[in-house]
Amino acid sequence: MLMLSTMTLIIFIITIVVMMLATLLSKKTLLDREKCSPFECGFDPMNSSRLPFSLRFFLIAIIFLIFDVEIALLLPMIMIIKTSNLMNWTITSLFFIFILLIGLYHEWNQGALEWNE
């Protein structure tokens, strides 16, 4: 176990040293106005090249990702119903679903699921 810990520490230190050397030896580029601005036929751009996104779009995407992970956590619970104690499985499943419903209620109550705004 000591050898595994020592090797892990050595590999971690070597990785950090290599990354620091790569950062120090890499070619530094100076950013000026031409490099930071989008190219538009050699002329200055007429308007901003970035379109504004609604923060609500990102919030809905994060909520979808969280609920997707929750579904992925619920699926194995169905598989282990045959091998586990039914009472323990029921209590664990109901507790987990209760926590998910509390989260859904909180998001609904905060208005995070409303598209009309």
UniProtKB/Swiss-Prot annotation:
Reactions catalysed: a ubiquinone + NADH + 5 H(+)(in) = a ubiquinol + NAD(+) + 4 H(+)(out)
EC number: 7.1.1.2
Keyword Electron transport included in the entry's annotation: yes
Disulfide bonds: none
Top-level taxon of the source organism: Eukaryota
Assigned keywords, A-Z: Electron transport, Membrane, Mitochondrion, NAD, Respiratory chain, Translocase, Transmembrane, Transmembrane helix, Transport, Ubiquinone
Segments traversing the membrane: 1-21, 58-78, 86-106
One Gene Ontology cellular component annotation held by this UniProt entry: mitochondrial membrane
Subcellular location: Mitochondrion membrane
Top-level EC class as recorded in UniProt: translocase
InterPro entries (alphabetical): NADH_UbQ/plastoQ_OxRdtase_su3, NDAH_ubi_oxred_su3_sf
Membrane topology label: Multi-pass membrane protein
GO molecular function: NADH dehydrogenase (ubiquinone) activity
Keyword Metal-binding: no
Family: Belongs to the complex I subunit 3 family.
Function according to Swiss-Prot or TrEMBL: Core subunit of the mitochondrial membrane respiratory chain NADH dehydrogenase (Complex I) that is believed to belong to the minimal assembly required for catalysis. Complex I functions in the transfer of electrons from NADH to the respiratory chain. The immediate electron acceptor for the enzyme is believed to be ubiquinone.
Name of this chain's protein: NADH-ubiquinone oxidoreductase chain 3
